[in-house]
């Protein structure tokens, strides 16, 4: 193993572990601020094995994205100024020649010509994520390969349906649309009357009582009248109204996925 990449949060210890084994490490960050925190707390101690820094753009990259509370998921930012800020920070701590790997939205290198051999950005590389899925060696179904080559604006959605609660990009499939519709049938609730949560509703076959905002009671009653009679609780103190059949399917999926 010559090198490892690591993201999924703030991998403070990856530099220490990689250096101990003589392996280069390539942390994944989504902003200069994230790298600054990693550098100050840990990476300055293992700079000799820092092979590069992967910048994973919060709006262009697929999968989970490192959006902070200071960034609007619905207002994408140009990646060039963000990567330039990262380079300036790296140069200030002696990493002017350490490569930055641009990840997210990279399909054709011709789209990035102004990045290559740019003295302000310094050494730059590019990470392909989706494109290798189209190769002959890729085991995914041909139907998915065809879908990837025909995507248009609006076919990729930045959403929060992941169990992690983080923003992530996904192709706007029928399943994502189903999750959107479910999410629209969601209200906050309390087990007992509290503050403005004074409107009582009874849900499920046992008529379990819960308290919601008065405006939400009217919505909930309409959803239940339309057949969405089961209220599934979420960790965010909300309930999602679904049909009895949907509830059974969700519970089965949860049981089948236990430990997976």
Task: Give the predicted meaning of each segment.
Residues 60-77, 87-97, 109-260:
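Conserved active-site-proximal phosphate/metal-binding subdomains
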Residues 1-95:
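Active-site entrance/lid segments in N-terminal catalytic domains of soluble metabolic enzymes
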Residues 28, 56, 103, 128-129:
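Generic beta-sheet signal
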């Amino acid at each position: 193993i010559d090198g490892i990449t690591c993201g999924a949060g703030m991998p403070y210890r990856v530099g220490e572990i990689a250096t101990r084994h003589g392996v280069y490490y390539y942390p994944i960050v989504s902003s200069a601020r994230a790298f600054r925190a990693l550098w100050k707390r840990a990476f300055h101690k293992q700079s000799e094995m820092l092979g590069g820094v992967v910048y994973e753009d919060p709006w262009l990259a697929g999968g989970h994205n490192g959006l902070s509370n200071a960034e609007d998921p619905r207002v994408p930012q140009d990646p060039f100024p963000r990567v330039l800020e990262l380079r300036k920070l790296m140069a200030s701590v002696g990493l002017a020649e350490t490569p930055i790997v641009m990840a997210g939205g990279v399909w054709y290198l011709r789209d990035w010509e102004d990045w290559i051999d740019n003295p302000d950005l310094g050494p730059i590389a590019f990470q392909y994520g989706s494109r290798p899925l189209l190769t002959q060696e890729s085991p995914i179904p041909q139907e998915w390969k065809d879908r990837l080559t025909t995507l248009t604006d609006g076919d990729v959605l930045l959403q929060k349906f992941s169990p992690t609660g983080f923003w992530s990009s996904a192709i706007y499939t029928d399943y994502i649309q189903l999750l959107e519709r479910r999410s629209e049938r969601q209200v906050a609730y309390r087990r007992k009357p509290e503050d403005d949560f004074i409107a009582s509703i009874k849900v499920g076959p046992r008529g379990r009582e819960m308290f919601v905002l008065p405006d939400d009671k009217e919505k909930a009653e309409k959803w239940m009248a339309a057949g969405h009679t089961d209220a599934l609780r979420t960790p965010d103190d909300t309930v999602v109204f679904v049909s009895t059949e949907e509830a059974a399917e969700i519970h089965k999926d949860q049981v089948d996925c236990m430990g997976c």
